[in-house]
Amino acid sequence: MTSKVPVFRLDDLKSGKVLTELAEAVTTKGIFYLTESGLVDDDHTSARETCVDFFKNGSEEEKRAVTLADRNARRGFSALEWESTAVVTETGKYSDYSTCYSMGIGGNLFPNRGFEDVWQDYFDRMYGAAKDVARAVLNSVGAPLAGEDIDDFVECDPLLRLRYFPEVPEDRVAEEEPLRMGPHYDLSTITLVHQTACANGFVSLQCEVDGEFVDLPTLPGAMVVFCGAVGTLATGGKVKAPKHRVKSPGRDQRVGSSRTSSVFFLRPKPDFSFNVQQSREWGFNVRIPSERTTFREWLGGNYVNMRRDKPAAAEAAVPAAAPVSTAAPIAT
């Protein structure tokens, strides 16, 4: 583990025992490891194995049934290389070399009842931990939240995604394309990330800390916490939203480089509003031509091209699904 990233126990965050240390971490780095979160390895393992089994063994018909044609939706299944963080952030044209499943509060698409039972329980447990972390982060910097109570603020519109990063092919090794997923900050208040380690020891996840990207290895019993752009906006610029990325392995580490990450974005309510010019001054790419905008509008403009274009035949095979509730807008 890099010495630049602190580690906190959830109980210590909730009790205020490490209030000063937490405030320093979120205002200067925007990242820390979280231990004793209330979730145990079995919680993560069950959700991960259920999802990866579907990725590997689900039929094409089953996958089409939980794939939305709506380019803006973040629900259900996204096939390998269907998304591109690099295109959205204007840092490249390469795809995210991963397969993904997403769910939220409502409008979900589950492959079967067993999958739904496992994932609904996992979602609820991650949501509880994320709210506890967000309360601690916001309290540590004395966030005013424009008069809104913190408990009300964290009852919001979260998103849970599991990404499976398979071993990369020869044309996606680091010598050909350095990244599996482009550098980005999260559109969330905070984000919880539970990652599995690559079997060959390669560390794929990195975060920008003190001006350089540092490795974020898997720690037993720990999750990574990223502070997101909404955390910055909600605290008047106090909380830092760091950029992070996923590296590609070199040719000598290609075999054994598969990994997963369960990512829980604590996103605000869709009508969360903020000052556009101020957000730009804090480094966020908000191009909406108005003085103020909402989280819903920001997502709609910023992530419309998250899903990469596919051949017409492939797109035609994806049926249009029922519209997702407006309480569940586009994903990070």
Swiss-Prot record:
The keyword Transcription does not apply. Pathway: Antibiotic biosynthesis; cephalosporin C biosynthesis. The keyword Iron applies. One of its GO terms (biological process) is antibiotic biosynthetic process. It holds the Pfam family DIOX_N. It comes from the Eukaryota. Keywords: Antibiotic biosynthesis, Iron, Metal-binding, Multifunctional enzyme, Oxidoreductase, Vitamin C. GO terms for molecular function: deacetoxycephalosporin-C hydroxylase activity; deacetoxycephalosporin-C synthase activity; iron ion binding; L-ascorbic acid binding. Residues 155-268 form the Fe2OG dioxygenase domain. InterPro entries: DIOX_N (IPR026992), IPNS-like_FE2OG_OXY (IPR044861), IPNS-like_sf (IPR027443), Iron_ascorbate_oxido_reductase (IPR050231), Isopenicillin-N_synth_CS (IPR002057), Oxoglu/Fe-dep_dioxygenase_dom (IPR005123). Fe cation binds at residues 184, 186, 244. It catalyses: penicillin N + 2-oxoglutarate + O2 = deacetoxycephalosporin C + succinate + CO2 + H2O; deacetoxycephalosporin C + 2-oxoglutarate + O2 = deacetylcephalosporin C + succinate + CO2. Its EC number is 1.14.20.1, 1.14.11.26. Gene3D superfamilies: B-lactam Antibiotic, Isopenicillin N Synthase, Chain (2.60.120.330). Its cofactor is Fe cation; L-ascorbate. DAOCS catalyzes the step from penicillin N to deacetoxy-cephalosporin C, which is used as a substrate by DACS to form deacetylcephalosporin C. PANTHER family: 2-OXOGLUTARATE (2OG) AND FE(II)-DEPENDENT OXYGENASE SUPERFAMILY PROTEIN-RELATED. Belongs to the iron/ascorbate-dependent oxidoreductase family. This is Cephalosporin biosynthesis expandase/hydroxylase.
